[in-house]
Each structure stands twice: as structure tokens, then as C-alpha cells.
């Protein structure tokens, strides 16, 4: 039944788009995987998880490809025909109408989208880590009022280790502490 369906598109033009999705994730790939097939359908707006689901496409893909799990361009067309057949069974429309609707959406799509990739934003991290008001104890001395680090002077207490005895610290502090 699916084999009788015809494709109303320019094969060479769609083949270029098919190649782009085939190479998505593997630049040297020559056959499309089920994952890339689902991405192609999802980016085109065909795979909506209501009328056409990933399960439907997975079953159709494995019917055509069998154990090899990858499809050539002609095999991909057969998979599309199976998907259109499943969709037509649900919608009670002719298979050719469903296939035309699917192929029209796929033909409009240029290349895989890479939307949703997270971009690192470190501005919040730096402002949080250099906000001296959030630190307590000796750590709050590491930054000045603008949040700029003081360097070694903020990390270490500098004392003068000079005097008449080797371990004597804080030279000239006796008179200050004993009131003389």
C-alpha cells in the first residue's frame, strides 16, 4: 500500500536537505539513522508527538531498514510512505494527501536547527563570588568595596617579624599594649 504512493518534490533538492540531516552529528555519514530521521521530521514540524509520534517513525524505520538501522535516500522515502500510511489510517484521509503534506513540510526545511543549546553566562557567577558583603570573617577582607580582589594583602596578615629575639613579633608594640 505504501509503495504505491508518489512523491511530489524535486529529488535533487530534497536529497541535499536529506544529506544535511544525514551528516548531523556525524560529518562522514552516508546513510540516515533513526535519530536523524526523527530530527528531520521534528524540525519540519511533522513529528508532533500527537498525530505522528517517535514510536510510529521508529517502527516504520525498522520495517524498512531491518537490522542495519541506517537508511539510504530511497529507503528513507519508503519510511516516509509508511509514516504517511500510519497517519492516513488515523486521520481517515487518503495516503497520498498525508504524504503530500509531509513532503511539503520536509521540502521547505533547509538545514538542521541547533536551537536550545545552552550558552554559558558567567556574569552572575563572578558577581556572586566577588561580592564582599556575602563573605564573613577574614574572607571579607579579600575584596575592596568595588568587589575587586586585593591580592596577597587580602589573603595574608602581614606582621613584622623583627626584634632582638628571633621569634619576636610586632616590633614596638609593648609600649602600646602596656600603656607606657
UniProtKB/Swiss-Prot annotation:
Gene Ontology molecular function terms on file: tubulin binding
Gene Ontology process terms (BP): microtubule bundle formation; microtubule polymerization; positive regulation of protein polymerization
Cysteines paired by S-S bonds: none
Pfam families: p25-alpha (PF05517)
Bias (Basic and acidic residues): 136-158, 169-180
Highest taxon, organism lineage: Eukaryota
Region (Disordered) residue spans: 136-180
InterPro entries reported in the protein's UniProt record: EF-hand-dom_pair, TPP/p25
Known role: Regulator of microtubule dynamics.
Family: Belongs to the TPPP family.
Name by which UniProt lists this protein: Tubulin polymerization-promoting protein homolog
Biological source species: Caenorhabditis elegans
Lineage: Eukaryota, Metazoa, Ecdysozoa, Nematoda, Chromadorea
Gene designation per UniProt: tppp-1
Amino acid at each position: 500500500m505504501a509503495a504505491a504512493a508518489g512523491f511530489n518534490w524535486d529529488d535533487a533538492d530534497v536529497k541535499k536537505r536529506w544529506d544535511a540531516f544525514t551528516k548531523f552529528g556525524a560529518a562522514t555519514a552516508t546513510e540516515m539513522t533513526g535519530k536523524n530521521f526523527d530530527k528531520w521530521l521534528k524540525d519540519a514540524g511533522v513529528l508532533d508527538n500527537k498525530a505522528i509520534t517517535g514510536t510510529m517513525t521508529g517502527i516504520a524505520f525498522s520495517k524498512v531498514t531491518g537490522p542495519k538501522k541506517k537508511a539510504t535516500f530511497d529507503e528513507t522515502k519508503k519510511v516516509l510512505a509508511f509514516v504517511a500510511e500510519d497517519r492516513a489510517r488515523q486521520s481517515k484521509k487518503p495516503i497520498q494527501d498525508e504524504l503530500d503534506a509531509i513532503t511539503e513540510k520536509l521540502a521547505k526545511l533547509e538545514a538542521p536547527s541547533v536551537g536550545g543549546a545552552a550558552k554559558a553566562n558567567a556574569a552572575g557567577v563572578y558577581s556572586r563570588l566577588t561580592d564582599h558583603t556575602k563573605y564573613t570573617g577574614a574572607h571579607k577582607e579579600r575584596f575592596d568595596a568595588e568587589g575587586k580582589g586585593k591580592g596577597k594583602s587580602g589573603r595574608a596578615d602581614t606582621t613584622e617579624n623583627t626584634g632582638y629575639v628571633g621569634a619576636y613579633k610586632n616590633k614596638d608594640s609593648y609600649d602600646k599594649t602596656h600603656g607606657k
